[in-house]
Amino acid sequence: MFYCLLVLIALTALILGPPLWAKRKDIATEQRLLVSMLYFGAIGAGFMGVELAVVQIMTLLLGHPTYALSVVIMGLLAFAGLGSVVMQSLPLQRVDMVLLAGVLLIAGLAFTLLPFVHTVLDTGFVTRIAITLSVLLVVGLVLGMPFVGGIRTLGEDREHAVAWAWACNGAASVIGSNIFMIVMVFSGSRVALLGASSAYIIAFLTRRRLAGRALS
């Protein structure tokens, strides 16, 4: 896993390094561009941390990794997409509230999800799937909003900034997924969820600076 992480970091540097070098003057002088990269990287890594930890926990509930992967990935992405749609009609001022809710929700899951799963292990399979989807509905709605909120904060007409947002989010998702897998192997899903919550704290803090500066 560590070897895979090093390879992913090297590939990311190879892909993003040249354009970053070409934009080094803009990045050095335009703080908002750097802040936006940190914001979208944080929510990308944090989302993957939640996804992987929930897959691990729901494997216990659903009885097989294949079921957990299918239900969690499908459910989380679908509900996150729904959250993105909802965010398009909400005031931008709500983004901070959503991020704070995400921090608290993920931290709460770290301490309550596994004990809750143990209490419903004796229910029927269909019921367990319904329980899983209910959890994912709440998580997906909340975690699906910050990306769209960030894009709206940047301004969709700022094409270069939006492109960097997608790039940093994708790169952080790939590298973050590997990091959180390592964390779960050595420390378990609770620590992984707390790490994901910390990533959303970073997003919460950077979002204020992102909204407070004009991008040239």
PLM segments and residue spans:
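Alpha-helical transmembrane segments of multi-pass membrane proteins
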Residues: M1-S216
